Curated annotation (Swiss-Prot):
Name of the featured protein: Chaperonin GroEL
Function: Together with its co-chaperonin GroES, plays an essential role in assisting protein folding. The GroEL-GroES system forms a nano-cage that allows encapsulation of the non-native substrate proteins and provides a physical environment optimized to promote and accelerate protein folding.
Family affiliation: Belongs to the chaperonin (HSP60) family.
Listed GO biological process terms: protein refolding
EC number: 5.6.1.7
One cellular component (GO) term of this entry: cytoplasm
SUPFAM superfamilies membership: GroEL apical domain-like, GroEL equatorial domain-like, GroEL-intermediate domain like
Source species: Saccharophagus degradans (strain 2-40 / ATCC 43961 / DSM 17024)
NCBIfam families hit by this protein: GroEL (TIGR02348), PRK00013.1 (NF000592), PRK12849.1 (NF009487), PRK12850.1 (NF009488), PRK12851.1 (NF009489)
Reaction(s) catalysed by this chain's protein: ATP + H2O + a folded polypeptide = ADP + phosphate + an unfolded polypeptide
Keyword line: ATP-binding, Chaperone, Cytoplasm, Isomerase, Nucleotide-binding
Keyword Repressor among UniProt keywords: no
Binding site for ATP: 29-32, 50, 86-90, 414, 478-480, 494
Length: 547
């Protein structure tokens, strides 16, 4: 396949054109008065969004060189989204500002490598300043404010996320699903829930909800299949004497053993129910151990020299309540020792740090949540499917932002923190004039998000930027109301992690673009789609639309 190669200024101008097309589309969504972007979908209604990364993902340009520029900026948005969950539009605006100024300086004859070194110095100094001014975000009010700002000033979203975090703790799992109503709903599962239900409908004792509800049970955990009732008899007799109910969690309970348990339960000899252990293979062993630690029991496993016949009441865990439906089982208020649970959580966290697989990380985080907190589900409600998708994306963004805020703290929002970072590094010096120019480019670029927020709100960007620059600390501009004042008092907060990631991602990609000297792309085929028909096979022309 023949290639086209472009060099120097010609290559950079093409790349810049692509950067500007993508960034101009994305930056219209920035701020409380950001505009909507409508995305065409090949099936169904178009999607309306104010989410920067959704807009960026849609853009593919026809010119291959321009498209390379656009894709590199798209990478900035994706990086910000992956690392912090938000700040995609801010990162794109910063990258565009640095690239535009940087390429002008390269065209004026400055050394691209020194410009990049200067930009990197300024980025590192700005990130250090952001970290230094971050304030912890721990109370429900500030969590709600961060969620509200990230969900495009929708206070209902901020409040529901704060409520979810209050109920399941900072470590709890919060998931977002499409609801069936018109309003957002919060559904909280206390305790440990796993996706295995009762093994026989004959265990059901609540006919209304078709579930098994057992109070203050003993819990027997077995890492094997139970098919012979003789193995179970010693434990069953001991439990029957104690007068408490029994919950069995095993790899499986089948045949004679299951039939005997059902008969005992129905006759009221011993109140018992059984379910399969969650997970498979090594993950099942680990999750059984989690349940053991949560309930203060021991897993009966031949690997550790314990068999079912020698099990006693000391080996059994207990809990305040166990509920089982056809699909799920929930253990509430296990009797485990708090210190043991904490050390187990710390152990799983260490595994999260080490794993390179996203799937494993997600499963490990779920285990932490089940041990440490609980699980909350936010069900997003809307009138139409288009609105539902847009709203769900906003709630997910807001959730990521609040997690980032809890992790690294918050800074004044609305572009104010970046203006303060620019002022803090104004005296930074490089090793030569070209590096100083690079530092200057990055400092000026830090004003771009505030200017864009103001112009999206219909204000005069230069006037507002000067006024905010002349202020101190948290003094900034509230674009939603058009007022100046303390951003923290207005409740306009950005997670420090989001601001930091946006600066780093933008600086990194912009540095690469400024130092680009050649671009290579496939040569387009002659005539493209309008090639002459293939003799007698002219009828195949219509197949183009089928691809």
């Amino acid at each position: 396949m023949a290639k086209i190669v472009k060099f120097g200024d010609e290559a950079r101008q093409k790349m810049l054109a692509g950067v500007n097309v993508l960034a101009d589309a994305v930056k219209t969504t920035l701020g409380p008065k950001g505009r909507n972007v409508v995305l065409d979908k090949s099936f169904g209604a178009p999607t309306v969004t104010k989410d920067g990364v959704s807009v960026a993902k849609e853009i593919e340009l026809e010119d291959k060189f321009e498209n390379m520029g656009a894709q590199m900026v798209k990478e900035v948005a994706s990086k910000a989204s992956d690392d912090a969950g938000d700040g995609t539009t801010t990162a794109t605006v910063l990258a565009q500002a640095i690239v535009n100024e940087g390429l002008k300086s390269v065209a004026a004859g400055m050394n691209p490598m020194d410009l990049k070194r200067g930009i990197d110095k300024a980025v590192n100094a700005a990130v250090a300043h952001i970290k230094s001014i971050a304030q912890p975000c721990e109370d429900g009010k500030s969590i709600a404010q961060v969620g509200t700002i990230s969900a495009n000033s929708d206070s209902h979203v901020g409040d529901i996320i704060a409520e979810a975090m209050a109920k399941v703790g900072k470590e709890g799992v919060i998931t977002v699903e499409e609801g069936s109503g018109l309003e957002n709903e919060l559904d909280v599962v206390e305790g440990m829930q796993f996706d295995r239900g009762y093994l026989s409908p004959y265990f059901i004792n609540n006919q209304e909800s078709m579930s098994v509800e057992i109070e203050q049970p003993y819990i027997l955990l077995v890492d094997k299949k139970i098919s012979n009732i003789r193995e179970l008899l010693p434990v069953l007799e001991a439990v029957a004497k104690s007068g408490k109910p029994l919950v069995i969690v095993a790899e499986d309970v089948e045949g004679e053993a299951l039939a005997t348990l059902v008969v005992n339960n129905m006759r009221g000899i011993v109140k018992v129910t059984a379910c399969k252990a969650p997970g498979f293979g090594d993950r099942r062993k680990a999750m059984l151990q989690d349940i053991a630690i949560l309930t203060g029991g021991t897993v009966i496993s031949e690997e550790v020299g314990l068999d079912l016949e020698s099990a006693t009441l000391e080996h059994l865990g207990s809990a305040k309540r166990v509920t089982m439906t056809k699909e799920n089982s929930t253990i509430v208020d296990g009797a485990g020792v708090a210190a043991d649970i904490e050390s187990r959580v710390a152990q799983i966290r260490a595994q999260i740090e080490e794993t390179s697989s996203d799937y494993d990380r997600e499963k490990l985080q779920e285990r932490v949540a089940k041990l440490a907190g609980g699980v909350a589900v936010i069900k997003v409600g809307a009138m139409t499917e288009v609105e539902m998708k847009e709203k769900k994306a906003r709630v997910e963004d807001a959730l990521h932002a609040t997690r980032a805020a809890v992790e690294e703290g918050v800074v004044p929002g609305g572009g104010t923190a970046l203006i303060r970072a620019a002022a803090a590094i104004a005296d930074l010096k490089g090793d030569n004039e070209d590096q100083n120019a690079g530092i200057g480019i990055a400092i000026r670029a830090l004003e771009a998000p505030l200017r864009q927020i103001v112009s999206n709100a219909g204000g005069e960007a230069s006037v507002v930027a000067d006024k905010v620059k002349n202020g101190e600390g948290n003094f900034g501009f509230n674009a939603a109301s058009g007022e100046y004042g303390d951003m923290l008092e207005f409740g306009i907060l950005d997670p420090a992690k989001v601001s930091r990631t946006a600066i780093q991602a933008a600086g990194s990609i912009a540095g690469l673009m400024i130092t680009t000297e050649a671009m290579i792309a496939d040569k387009p085929s002659e005539g493209g789609a309008a090639a002459p028909d293939m003799g007698g096979m002219g009828g195949m022309g219509g197949m183009g639309g089928m691809m």
